[in-house]
Every structure is written in structure tokens, then in C-alpha cells.
Amino acid sequence: MSDKKRINQIAKETGLTNAELVSAAQTLGFEVKSHSSSVTAEQAEKIIQSAKTGTDQTAKVAEKPVKKSQPKAAESAKKNKEDHPRTFAGKAVVEDPAILARIKAKEEAEKAAKVEVASTEHPVVTEKPKASEPVKKAEPKVEAKSEPKVEKVETKDNTATSKAEVKPENVADKKEPVVTEEKKKSLTQKPRIQIKVIKRAEDIKKEQAAARPEKKKFDKNRNDRNNRSDNRRPNQNGNGQGGNHYDKNRSSGQGQNQGQKRDKFASSGSAPATDSFTPATSGKTSRRDRDRKKSDNNRDNTKDGNRKGGPLRVNDNRNQVRNARNSNWNQKGGRGRYQNNQSSSVPATQRKFHELPESLEYEVGMNVQDIAKSIKREPAEIIKKLFMMGTMVNQNQSLDEDTIELILMDYGVTPVKKVEEDKSDIERLFVEDGYLKEENMVERPAVVTIMGHVDHGKTTLLDRFRESRVTEGEAGGITQHIGAYQIKANGKKITFLDTPGHEAFTSMRARGASVTDITILVVAADDGVMPQTIEAINHSKAAGVPIIVAINKIDKPGANPQRVTQELTEHGVFPVAWDPENGSEFVEISAKFNQNLDELLDTVLLVAEVQELKADPTVRAIGTVVEARLDQGKGAIATLLVQQGTLHVQDPIVVGNTYGRVRTMTNDLGRRIKEAGPSTPIELTGLSDVPQAGDHFAVFEDEKAARAAGEERAKRAQLIKRQNTRRVNLDNLFDTLKEGQTKSVNIIIKADVQGSAEALAASLQKIEVEGVKVDIVHSAVGAISESDISLAAASNAIIIGFNVRPTGLAREQAAQEEVDIRLHSIIYKVIEEVETAMRGMLDPEFKEEIIGEAIVRETFNVSKVGTIAGFMVIRGKVARDASVRVIREGVVIHDGAIASLKHFKDDVKEVGNAQEGGLMVEDFNDVEIDDTFEVYKMVEIERK
């Protein structure tokens, strides 16, 4: 790093320790938390200088007092336990007569008191030197909290001359080699500010009284460390090595472990040294004081009930150690990580009382938990009430209507049964008054449906309106599914629906009339009124839609508009000139030569203006399916006409018995759009299945509701389909038996759009051939797939593809399964082919044809052969392959085949008129003279 350096990198370069550098940086006020913290180059220089200065001063000034650390003092005390009592209480150091005289002047009780005060009040003593010695400013505040007794007693003798700086010199002059070894061992340690001048007992007591307020904040950490050291005493060995090991593992353990070392030293077996300064009762007093302070600290730390459960119990050493350890780790000025977890001693608030509602709207199937939430009562209370009433339930068990009303009335609540709204009924939105808002109504484009007989020019007229070549895309020039388009005329939009004119598309014409506002009835001037023209008139009248008559092809030589007008009046369509109130507008046009087309559009706009067509674009969109198909790449595609509201991309939608989310929307020009307003035809993707043409659609609030409504509608449709199964009863028994003898042609229909498949199925079922009927096994949209081949093979069906092709795998499978696939693009050719196939399936019909008559003249009985009758042909002929009836006195006594036929002795195929011959009737020998033979054949006749 060029600009910044980490503390550990500086330590490697300078040879200093990480702790020294971190301490120096913190002293200088830099934001350094650990050895991995980064500082700038300028800050690094300051930290290095400060650390080196502190190290030098530590080696010169403070190392000697620090050498009197707990382990060394404990070791020296142990070595001189019996023969060198001067290793403790200053005797190992003090050899000056003046100092000895002053020590002798003090009584043993005063010395014990001094030691006790030094051990308990040391933080107060260390606080003063800390401010007076600039060398020790880098030491943590915690290090000054606990001080071992030995060091304090030793420093007491040395403090007679000077402060901390003078102390090392005096000690160096008077110390034994043991002290020198201690000094060498603690060179790397920081100076201990705890080695201070200890005054007389009277002075210390005065300072204690004056500094008692300052002392309180140090008591907590010191006592916690004392408790932790008490817990570790059993793990120490005789020479106190356990304390040393713990001290080495602490990164900043100078001050924290001093209190531990003091206690360890006191318990390591240095009895003589302790006795020389401490009376027998001093240990009890010290422990009693510590217990008192610990309880005070626990009370201070407790806020409305401590997590540890109040004051520490003196007799439970295990809990003391555990609680003291926890409190030691959380000493952060009341901001420990466990402070927020302290339980409150404030009593729990009582449950608020809720008033019972006057009435409750319920629905059948509610459980106890639902009722409890509604009336703000406990579920157990309701279960108890029901149990007392003799009903055993749990809180999740559904309740019937009587039980719900009973429990509500017991509480004094009036039960009101909820009226369930059938959200799957989207048809109600088209007739519901409250769905649309009058204030949001705006003018909408008119929806115009073009109707008329086949080849009367409907698509050509629309093609002129759109200025495109729509007609070229139609097979044979016949429109075979609805096209929805939108054009502009005089600044206003008009939506056109082009419907088929072929007789097979009756349902499509009815569907187009149901969603339209105006009907343009196209009639060819040379053909006049045709069957589909009459049908279109009836559809428009049934829907209550005004009719505009467009008399087309007036450019042809044989055009006769007057005759067309006369024929239309016979079917209830009158010109406005004849019936001003209910008359229809008549416009003579030529779509081929664009003659009078503007006049026709102006008439459409005029009629639309009179109708005052309006819609509410603010509501969720509703409308009708114009057409639907299945695309191999896009899936289900539906052509919709939005009638109310605005449809957006990603709207959850229910279309007929299917549902989905609007994935994409395209207009009649094939362009992607984001929204579609009223009277707009669009083509969308995203449905789960192909809907039926003519189904209604509605947008729901979310996809979950749309899914539920779609699945419910599909379930109901399936149920209705199952209910349509015919049941055999006495009324239809004869028809059922007759149908059992009737043959059927099984057909699978696959078409490009739903409307074409529907029309084709209806047309095929109308074919009437006696003895044969059409059975539509399956009808769907999309390409012919392998599953269709498998179904056809299983049901022995013929597959008819209308504007679709089979896939490669389907074609191979059809060849293997020997399934017949017929592909067509014009509907009437499909009808003719199916009708021919139906006639070919019929059993042949035969009629009896009499070819001759003969009279028996003689009979001959031949053994082992039978009776041979000699006959004379009186009319026609007798053939060998014909049948014969034996008639006696006008009664047929036998009908059978001719076994053999001979003319004289020769076998012949037939015997002509006025000739004699002999024959033998198969399985009949009772032939007599004068019997008559009636010879006939069964001849097949053609079925019509």
C-alpha cells in the first residue's frame, strides 16, 4: 500500500510490537483498533516516534517496579518461605538503618492495616501518579485497577525518598539478584503505574475518604477479576505457574491480571510473609469487604431486575464465578451486549377488554379460531362454551351454520350469514349496473360487423377500407374465421368484424352479431337475397342491432338494386324512405371500384352518433373472445374485443374456462401495444389453454383470484358435460337399440382456429346418411401431433386437418399405425369427402329378383344321393348359382339353394325356357310331382 500502512507492517519494519504501536496510536488520538488497522505515512512516523519514546522511558523508569510482578514475587516468596522472611513486606530490600528505624516505629497492627488499605484502596493511589507521570500515559486505564500486595508493600519502603522516577534508582542500589532477574523478565512489559509511594495509614485513610466517589467506578472490574482469580486458584501449581500462563495469553493483561496475581500469591503458600504484615483477622475482613462491594456492584448494575437474578449468593461459589465472569465481559458503561436482554421487573400489563360487536357476518365453515378473532375472545373460552353445550370441537375444526349461530347468540352477538359472491361468474359484469360509473363514461368507437352471403364481396369491402390485400390470404376466396380490424374515418375510429358467409359458420355470424353495434348487410346486386343473407338479417334482429344495407356489385351488367330492395322488404328490412322510424339505410356501392365507399362510412358514423356509444375506461377490462387458436411457438392465442375498461399487459385475466396473465398484446397491424381501450381488437398470449370463440373475458385483481375463478369455471364446464350423458329409459329405449345397430364414423378434427374447428364439427354432424352417423372423438386447434395419432389408432378414427399439417414424427407414426389423415383448406370439400366415406361404410342392400319358374314332371330316388326332380321351365330360366323355393299348392314348403343342375346327363350352369332338366335341392328330398320351383337371385342395390 503506497498511501497507508497497516500496524502489523509497521511493526515488522521497526521491530516494535503490535501492542506498543496500537497503544501509541490510541494515545495520539488516531482511530486504530487493532494491528490490522491502517494509518497514513505521516501518522505512522508519529506513532513510531511515540512508541520508541515510550519504550525507552519504560526501560529506564518503570521496568524495575514492574519487575515486582505477581509471579516473580510469588516465586521469591516461595523460595524464602521458611528461611528468608525478608522476601516479603520489604525485608528483602530494606537494609538502610534509617528506614529500618522508621519501620520498627510502627506497630504490627498498623502494618496490617496499611497492607489491607493498600490492597483495597490501591486504585485511588494509582490515579494520582498516573496524572503526574507522563511516561505512563500509554498504559490502558484498566491496568491501573488492581495491584498485588507485595509490590505495594515493597514500594512503601522505597517511597520515603522520592516518586516513581527515584524509586528505580533506590531499588537498584538495594535490591538483591532476585530483583535483577525479575527486571530482565519484564523488559517487554509496560511500566506499571501501580507501584506508587504508599503513605502512612492515617494519610491513606484520609485519601480514601476524599477519593471514595472516584473509587466506585473501579470497584466493579476489580471485584470481577478477583472472583475470576478465585475460580482459577484450584488450577494453579505450587509456584504460581498457572497465573503466569493465563497472563501470557492476554494481549493487554498487565493491569487486569495484577489482581489475580495478588490473590494467587496469597494462596500459593507464602504464609510467613503474609503473617509478617497481616493479622489473623485481616483475611476475613478483606473477604467480607469484597462480598459487600460485590453485592453493591450487583445492585448498581441491576436495572429493574438483573438477568442474573439479583444479588449474588455468597454460598454458591459456582454462581459467583459465572456471574462475575459475565459481568466482567459486559463492563462497557452499561452498554454490554447482554444489557438489552435484561428482563424487566415491571409487572405484565393486563389484557385489554374488547367490547363484543352487535352483529357478526359469518360464513359456513368457520372454525373456533376465526370466531375468536372476530369477537376478540380466547379460543379456549369458546371451546369451553361449546363443551358445556354438548359439542366437542377443537379450534381448527370447521363448524356448521347452526353451531356458529348458537355460539354467537350465546355471546349476545347477532349472527348474519354472509352472502357469498360467485367471483367465477364473469358474465354478471356485463349486466351489473354498479360495475360502470356514469361520471367516467366517454365516447367509444363503434363496432361494425360485415355480414352477407358467400362471395357477395364482404372481404373485398373491408379490404378497401383497410387498403390491404386481405382477400388474397383466403383459401378459395372464402373467409373462414373472423377478422377484427380498426380503421379511421373522418378522424374517428371504427372497429370492423369480418364474419364468414358460408352456411357452416352460423355460430360465428351469431357471435359477431352479439358483440357488434352496427351491422353492414352486403347483398350482391346481381344475385339478390340468398339463404345466408336471410340468416344474417335474423341474427341482427335477434341482437337488436341496426342494419345498414350495402348493395354491392352495382358495376356489373346484370345488377338490379331495385329487385334487391324489393326482396329485402319481404324479410322485414325497409328503406328509411319507406319507414322513417324503423327503416334501414341503403347505400349502393361497388367495392371493386371504390364507388360510394365514403358515403357508406359517413352513414356508419351517423348511425353510431345517434346511438351515443359510451364506455368506462377506468374499470377492469371485460370483453368477448372473437377467435382463438394454438400456435406451436407461442401457445394459446386469443383474439379479443375489449368492450369496457382498459386491458394492460401483465393483467391477470380469465377467458372462458381458462385463465392466465396477459403476456403480450398486438393490434390488428401486428404491432405490440401496452394497453387497449374500449372497442379495441387485440391478439394476446399468456393463457393456460385455448378458449372457445364467443367466451367472455374479465380482468381480476390478482393472479391468485384469476386462477381460482378459471379452475372453478373449468370444473363446472366439465360437470355440465358429464351431465349431458344420455340415460336409457323407456322413452328412448327404442332409439338406443336402433343406434346400437347404426354404424358410426369416428373423426378427429384439428383446425387452425377454434371457430373453424367448431364450424367443421357442426357441419359434419349434420350429414344425414341412413345407418351411419358422425362421432367427433376430439376437436382442437393446433398441428396434428403424435398424441392425435395415438388417439386415432385407439378409437379407429379418421383425422381431418383443417389448415394444419402433421408434424414429422406424427406422419411417421401414422404410417406405422395405418391412421388415415385427410388435410383440407376448404370446408365444403371436407363435408363431401366425409359424406362419401359414410356411405361407403354401409352394409350393401339387396333386393330379390325372380329369374325363372319350373314345374316338376317326375321324381327319381337315387340311393346315397337323394331325390332328383325332373322339371320343365315354363318361364325365364333356372341358374346353377340361384336359389329356389319349393311351392306346393301355393305354400312355400322349402327355400334353399340348388345343389346340382343337369341337362340330360351333362352338368350345366343354367337351363333355358321351355327346356327340361333335372335338379336336386340342397338339404331337401321331399319333392313331389306338380310342385313348383320359383328360382330367384339377391341383387345388390346402390345406397343413396
From Swiss-Prot:
One Pfam family, short name: IF2_N
Domain of life: Bacteria
Organism expressing this protein natively: Lactococcus lactis subsp. lactis (strain IL1403)
Function as written in the Swiss-Prot or TrEMBL entry: One of the essential components for the initiation of protein synthesis. Protects formylmethionyl-tRNA from spontaneous hydrolysis and promotes its binding to the 30S ribosomal subunits. Also involved in the hydrolysis of GTP during the formation of the 70S ribosomal complex.
Protein name: Translation initiation factor IF-2
Gene designation per UniProt: infB
Family: Belongs to the TRAFAC class translation factor GTPase superfamily. Classic translation factor GTPase family. IF-2 subfamily.
The keyword Cytoplasm appears for this protein: yes
Matching HAMAP family: IF_2_B
